[in-house]
């Protein structure tokens, strides 16, 4: 095991004793907010300490087995114990590395997914529709619930813009690396010469706001408009002005919702999206400052970051951040995203481990 890992694990063992002491204090027990916070940390540290205790035990077993190799009568059994211990030690070290990685507080939250057509006109809008279908199908595979909060359908199909709310377990943590520019290369149905056209969409994945960290909104800095909700083809969903658009005047950030029939409900959801966009703006500004100090493997998640190319003639999808190419484009577009998302997750873990090692 690397020395920096052993040092980190020793600190966890020490911290466990400190937490045991804190949880026994009457003043801590009387403050339920503080008690729950310490109890959560205690559960996390206990898991790490327990696995590290197992690692130390198997390390001792390995040492004892090596001493028995010199005994002809025990050599075969000793070698079996050595092989078994080494295999488990490798597994435990990998597990401990993952447990030591910093937790992303928003990973467990629901998410808003915003897809916008970019360069490429009608073809870009059609591709926005393809991406919407891809994420919707992936959500169905995961048992997540998808709600369309707002949509601006294009005349020839697809969307100029669409905002989804996805509700489920670890939604943001799973989809957060989808933020950025998505480029498509294919022959449009209207192309008579068979030429490949390139167009693009942008995707923004934002965690549903945590009420405890909500940004204070001054009502005087909000403009709230109501309008009649309409779907694709201009068909009115209802005949009342139930759709709501909220503009944050200081930043110009806009959020709208037209999904529900209730103006009150649409306003509440639009304000949620606005909160998410304001928090995302703050996150992006922090990421830009951090990027000046180091270049992250996964990228900042900015819309300007071109993260992926979908090449239809070659049937391939390439993620430029981790230089991964998969020749299973149709399966991925049908919602089988796990091979790509898992590779991105592993890349992020490797990046975090390097940061941990650097201290």
Swiss-Prot record:
PTM comment, free text: Methylated by PrmC. Methylation increases the termination efficiency of RF1.
PROSITE patterns: RF_PROK_I
Protein name: Peptide chain release factor 1
Gene: prfA
PANTHER family in alphabetical order: LD18447P
Family under the similarity heading: Belongs to the prokaryotic/mitochondrial release factor family.
Primary role: Peptide chain release factor 1 directs the termination of translation in response to the peptide chain termination codons UAG and UAA.
Alphabetical keyword list: Cytoplasm, Methylation, Protein biosynthesis
SMART domains: PCRF
Alphabetized Pfam families for the sequence: PCRF, RF-1
Chain positions found as N5-methylglutamine: 235
Main location per the UniProt record: cytoplasm
Organism: Verminephrobacter eiseniae (strain EF01-2)
Source organism, top-level taxon: Bacteria
Protein location: Cytoplasm
GO CC terms in record: cytoplasm
Keyword Protein biosynthesis: yes
């Amino acid at each position: 095991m690397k020395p920096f890992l052993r040092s980190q694990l020793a600190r966890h063992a020490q911290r466990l004793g400190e937490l045991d002491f804190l949880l026994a204090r009457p003043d801590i027990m009387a403050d339920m907010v503080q008690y729950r916070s310490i109890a959560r940390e205690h559960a996390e540290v206990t898991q790490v300490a327990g696995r590290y205790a197992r690692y130390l035990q198997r390390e001792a077993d390995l040492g004892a087995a090596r001493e028995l190799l010199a005994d002809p009568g025990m050599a075969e059994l000793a070698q079996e114990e050595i092989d078994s211990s080494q295999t488990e030690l490798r597994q435990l070290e990998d597990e401990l590395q993952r447990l030591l990685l910093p937790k992303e507080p928003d990973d467990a939250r629901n998410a808003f997914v915003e897809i916008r057509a970019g360069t490429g006109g009608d073809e870009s809008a059609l591709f926005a529709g393809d991406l919407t279908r891809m994420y919707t199908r992936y959500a169905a595979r995961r048992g997540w619930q998808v709600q369309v909060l707002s949509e601006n359908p294009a005349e020839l199909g697809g969307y100029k813009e669409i905002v989804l709310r996805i509700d489920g377990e670890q939604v943001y943590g799973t989809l957060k690396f989808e933020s950025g520019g998505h480029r498509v290369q294919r022959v449009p149905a209207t192309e008579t010469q068979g030429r490949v056209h390139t167009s693009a969409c942008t995707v923004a994945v934002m965690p549903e706001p945590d009420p405890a960290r909500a940004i204070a909104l001054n009502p005087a800095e909000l403009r709230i408009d109501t309008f009649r909700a309409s779907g694709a083809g201009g068909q009115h969903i209802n005949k009342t002005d139930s759709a709501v658009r909220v503009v944050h005047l200081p930043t110009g950030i806009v959020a709208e919702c037209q999904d529900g029939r209730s103006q009150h409900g649409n306003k509440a959801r639009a304000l949620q999206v606005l909160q998410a966009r304001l928090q995302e703006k703050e996150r992006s500004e922090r990421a830009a400052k951090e990027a000046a100090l180091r270049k992250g493997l996964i990228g900042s998640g900015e819309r300007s970051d071109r993260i992926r190319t979908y090449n239809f003639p070659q049937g391939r999808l390439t993620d430029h951040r981790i230089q991964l190419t998969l020749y299973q484009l149709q399966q991925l577009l049908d919602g089988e995203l796990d091979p790509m998302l898992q590779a991105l997750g592993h890349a992020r873990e490797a990046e975090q481990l390097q940061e941990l090692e650097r201290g």
